[in-house]
């Protein structure tokens, strides 16, 4: 199912993350702090519950969910969001909605790395993590 995602992932690189955060409406100071953070991501599965834990010097977050079921998440920048994550062709697709807005976060394993693509409107950011 999602076994290829399980493990701890160490931040490797980031493209266009500040522009993506700006598109989300994240304030200047928070963008600057988040932009220099190098988070580790740990993904685990217990039965049919998937947990994604993100830890950095900026903020720690943790979310647990079942594929296809809506869940609430308070993001690292304090947005209160409604989310659904599905698995499509080996890609974890997360649709995140709040205040009439929507962003899509796609997680996939490519060449042994975790690649996270975040898109809102026409702005896309790509963050890459390697196995720790």
Swiss-Prot record:
Gene Ontology biological-process entries: cellular response to linoleic acid; long-chain fatty acid transport
Membrane spanning residue stretches: none
GO MF term (any one): long-chain fatty acid transmembrane transporter activity
Pfam families in the cross-refs: Lipocalin
GO cellular component: cytoplasm; nucleus
Location in the cell: Cytoplasm; Nucleus
InterPro entries, sorted: Calycin, Fatty_acid-bd, ILBP, Lipocln_cytosolic_FA-bd_dom
Record: residues binding (9Z,12Z)-octadecadienoate: 107, 127
Keyword Ribosomal protein: no
Motif Nuclear localization signal, chain ranges: 22-32
Keyword terms of this UniProt record: Cytoplasm, Lipid-binding, Nucleus, Transport
UniProt keyword rRNA-binding, yes or no: no
Domain notes: Forms a beta-barrel structure that accommodates the hydrophobic ligand in its interior.
Record text on subunit structure and interactions: Monomer.
Role played: Lipid transport protein in adipocytes. Binds both long chain fatty acids and retinoic acid. Delivers long-chain fatty acids and retinoic acid to their cognate receptors in the nucleus. Has the highest binding affinity for linoleic acid and decreasing relative affinity for eicosapentaenoic acid (EPA), alpha-linolenic acid (ALA), docosahexaenoic acid (DHA), oleic acid, palmitic acid and stearic acid, respectively.
Family: Belongs to the calycin superfamily. Fatty-acid binding protein (FABP) family.
Protein name per the record: Fatty acid-binding protein, adipocyte
Annotated source species: Pygoscelis papua
Gene: FABP4
């Amino acid at each position: 199912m999602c076994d290829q995602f399980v493990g701890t992932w160490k931040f490797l690189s980031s493209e266009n993350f500040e522009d993506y955060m700006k598109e989300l409406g994240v304030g200047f100071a928070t963008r600057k702090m988040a932009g220099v953070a190098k988070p580790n991501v740990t993904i685990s599965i217990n039965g049919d519950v998937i947990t994604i834990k993100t830890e950095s010097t900026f903020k720690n977050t943790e979310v647990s969910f079942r594929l296809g079921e809506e869940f609430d998440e308070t993001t690292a920048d304090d947005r209160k969001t409604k989310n659904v994550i599905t698995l499509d062709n080996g890609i974890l697709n997360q649709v995140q909605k709040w205040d009439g807005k929507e962003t899509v976060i796609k997680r996939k394993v490519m060449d042994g790395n975790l690649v996270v693509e975040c898109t809102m409107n026409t702005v896309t950011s790509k963050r890459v993590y390697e196995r720790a």
